[in-house]
Every structure is written in C-alpha cells, then in structure tokens.
C-alpha cells in the first residue's frame, strides 16, 4: 500500500486514475473505490464503485459515485 499523501506530490495523484484507492476520512472511516478524478487545486477526490468500511472491515454504505472534498479526507492510499 503506497501512502500518496507522504509519497508522490499531489500533482502525481492523477497517475492513479482508474486504480483502486482507499481514502481515510478525518472521522477515521475508510472509503474504498476506483479513482475517477482528482481536482489538483481543490484536492477533491471523485470515486466510483465506492464502499464505506468501518474499523472491523464491514461495509456500512456503498454507491456508484462520490465526491470527497479535501476538508473531509485525511489520507489517500493506493491498494
């Protein structure tokens, strides 16, 4: 698992388009999905086929498309 926040700079996140990613939110929920788009200036992540996973790894929510604003996410990982 590559920690993109501490690894490649934000302008390299676009290299992961189409990859399965894990986003840890500031409330420590983890959302897993396919990176569809990343807005560099606003650091907004767009995921498709996403799942919200709790601490035990159980899926609590899921959907086809979600936009996560930078103020909500804490870490971004390539799975």
Which stretches of residues belong to each language-model region?
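Conserved RNA-binding domains used in RNP assembly and mRNA/RNA metabolism
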Residues: 1-79
């Amino acid at each position: 698992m590559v920690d993109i926040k501490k690894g490649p700079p934000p302008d390299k996140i676009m290299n992961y388009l189409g990859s399965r990613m894990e986003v840890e939110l500031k409330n420590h929920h983890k959302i897993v999905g396919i990176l569809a788009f990343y807005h560099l200036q606003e650091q907004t992540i767009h995921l498709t086929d996403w799942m919200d996973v709790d601490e035990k790894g159980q899926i609590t929510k899921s959907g086809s498309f979600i936009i996560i604003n930078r103020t909500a996410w804490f870490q971004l990982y390539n799975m």
